């Protein structure tokens, strides 16, 4: 994983989460979570996605956000009764097989090294019920001509850096999700805030841990 000290970065990250808001709303729009579903948000950070989810007309009955950084979780807003935040790692989720109807992993996969990314995707497949939906958000190329012109130079820096710039590495995880048994059903790009790629996939995997 990119060598970002999330404990040190927690306050700064909370202040810039407005740059992620458009993509978080878009992936929730594509996912359409409902009141009779259980949702897991992996790498929830300061629970920005859960805050957006709580404002939806029909939020899920149960939502769990996990993050490796207690400092990030400490910046979460008050969430609805029955929702939960836990310290946990995306590569070893502390949940039984087929525990959730919906899962999200936003601004995570592009930060992970290949082996960790495969583990995280496999864990998401494991804890999702067959037919469950996964929404991912990763950094993607900008739409505008000026942004596209500068993007190769930005990517060259991001791929060499293991600190903050690494968070701008772009990634289309579609093929890796497909290899893990997911079937892509929709994708969308957002341009305001961080240029982002939103994917929604259906879980076709029946493989449990071990």
Language model features by range: what are they?
Residues 137-180, 185-188:
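C-terminal alpha-helical "lid/dimerization" subdomain adjacent to the S-adenosyl-L-methionine
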Residues 118-130:
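A short glycine-rich, Lys/Arg-flanked "PGG" loop and its adjoining helix->strand segment in the class I
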Residues 91-103:
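A short acidic, Gly/Pro-enriched loop at the edge of an enzyme's catalytic core
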Residues 180-182, 186-210:
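Core SAM-dependent methyltransferase catalytic element
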Residues 102-115:
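A short SAM/SAH-binding and catalytic strip from SAM-dependent methyltransferases
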Residues 38, 131-133:
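Short glycine-centered segments of the SAM/dcSAM-binding site in methyltransferase folds
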């Amino acid at each position: 994983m990119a060598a970002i000290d999330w404990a040190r970065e927690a306050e700064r990250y909370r202040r810039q989460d407005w740059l992620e808001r458009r993509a978080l709303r878009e992936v929730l729009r594509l996912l359409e979570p409902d009141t009779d579903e259980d949702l897991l948000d992996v790498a929830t950070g300061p629970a920005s996605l859960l805050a957006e989810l709580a404002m939806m007309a029909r939020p899920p009955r149960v939502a769990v956000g996990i993050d490796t950084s207690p400092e990030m979780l400490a910046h979460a807003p008050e969430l609805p009764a029955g929702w939960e935040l836990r310290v946990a790692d995306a590569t070893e989720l502390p949940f039984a097989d087929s525990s959730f109807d919906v899962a999200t992993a936003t601004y995570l996969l592009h930060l992970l090294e290949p082996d960790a990314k495969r583990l995280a995707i496999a864990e998401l497949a494991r804890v999702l019920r067959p037919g469950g939906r996964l929404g991912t958000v990763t950094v993607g190329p900008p739409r505008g001509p000026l942004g596209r012109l500068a993007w190769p130079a930005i990517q060259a820096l991001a791929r060499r850096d293991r600190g903050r710039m690494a968070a701008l590495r772009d990634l289309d995880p579609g093929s890796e999700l497909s290899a893990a048994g997911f079937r892509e059903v929709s994708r969308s790009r957002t341009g305001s805030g961080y240029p982002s790629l939103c994917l929604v996939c259906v879980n076709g995997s029946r493989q449990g841990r071990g």
